[in-house]
Amino acid sequence: LFAELGKLPYPSRRHAGCLIRRWLCRRLDRIQENKPEKLPLPAEKSRIRFLKQVSKSNTASLGVIDQRVCDFLAVLDQPEELRKKARGLGSSVNETNLSAAKIGDVEFVDYGNHSIVGYEAHGGQLRDEYIDLHLNTLARILSEKRLELREEADPAVWDITVKYVAHDISSLVKYATPTVVRVSDYDVTVLAITYSGLMDSLGGIEGLAEYEELFDSLVHEKVNYGAVPEPISKRYYELISLSNSSIF
């Protein structure tokens, strides 16, 4: 179409461009008019129900909801003084760890104690092959971070852990238990844990649902209408309202 328009004389081309522009603006206005309103923050009981659903199985949200819940759990799993220093919170599921130079979807670095903890969200069943692929990338990431880390301490001093958070870890053999792997001059502890196991270690779902502000900022706002593609927000609404019509 545009190739053919380019063959027209300038006055005709300009007129056609104005018409197309008006049509596009009308289409955008209609789309915005039909856009669903944002959901209010769910009540505590609904947050409990949502976390229970997420703990059971893959959320069928292309990894988006799984990763946002992993962010929420990771923050609560770390000391409060490190939470503001987290790298990767809320990042896109399409962002690569290599491009962001982080060892997991979210990373916490404690320079004072020379430790790094990364959390890698994985919806569904986790397999050894996935971890191996991630460790191959991790070697490149640590190579890039080597200068930064060496300024603080030698590689032997650093305590590095990657926690792989999935719904099912029963198929793991090589990494069925915490395993120390040598990666680019660093000893890295590989630890696989289920969503339900991590939730239990943090005091249980009921206790987690009480963190209203964190849930709002790390989960609710990130998957609400307007923040992600509409099908993801619809899936979030389904999970948050499942089996209860009065949720807010």
Name each region found by the language model.
Residues 68-248:
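Catalytic core segments in nucleotide and nucleic-acid processing enzymes
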Residues 1-70, 242-248:
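Interdomain/boundary linker segments immediately adjacent to catalytic/signaling cores
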